[in-house]
């Protein structure tokens, strides 16, 4: 969602952004495939848990990757009564998953340098949309991250930082 929002902002307000980093997404409409993650989180009765560790154990029944569970649990908060809650509005995200998956048609070409960083194992297929990306973002570069899926920054944080830092520091 962040990558799509950044691309829309860049296209609507040319010159506002000096460099653009887009992570594992293209300016196209995708089939909504994250709804199951959200439904799983939404189905948990958080009142049954006393610790984050207990919630992580429960989530491990659905999500094998520790790094992915840690990423999801960044949205898990505790209120003053020591009750857990999700920081994001899961119901709204589920209800609007189709709209979130769409990419609006915005005419014009970006003059912003853009880095499209993607996981080689990702189902989002950034390179399948290279021509579409180049049409809208002709100053784009592409950076694959080996052995990473869609959650590149979670799965390979050091490589992610290395690539992004190099791009942002370049002239």
Q: Where does each model-flagged region fall?
A:
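Cofactor-binding loop segments of dinucleotide-utilizing enzymes, especially the Rossmann-like FAD-
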Residues: 25, 119, 147
């Amino acid at each position: 969602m962040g990558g799509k929002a950044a691309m829309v902002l860049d296209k609507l307000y040319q010159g506002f952004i000096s460099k653009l980093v887009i992570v594992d997404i293209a300016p196209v409409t995708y089939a909504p495939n994250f709804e199951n993650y959200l439904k799983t989180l939404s189905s948990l009765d958080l009142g049954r848990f006393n610790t984050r560790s207990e919630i992580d154990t429960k989530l491990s029944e659905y999500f094998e990757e520790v790094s992915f569970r840690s990423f999801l649990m960044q949205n898990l908060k505790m209120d003053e009564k020591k009750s857990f809650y999700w920081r994001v509005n899961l119901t709204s995200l589920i209800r609007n998953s189709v709209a979130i998956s769409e990419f609006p048609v915005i005419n014009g070409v970006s003059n912003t340098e853009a880095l499209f960083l993607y996981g080689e194992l990702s189902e989002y297929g950034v390179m399948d949309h290279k021509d579409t990306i180049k049409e809208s973002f002709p100053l784009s570069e592409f950076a694959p991250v080996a052995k990473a899926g869609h959650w590149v920054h979670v799965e390979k944080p050091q490589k992610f930082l290395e690539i992004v830092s190099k791009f942002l520091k370049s002239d």
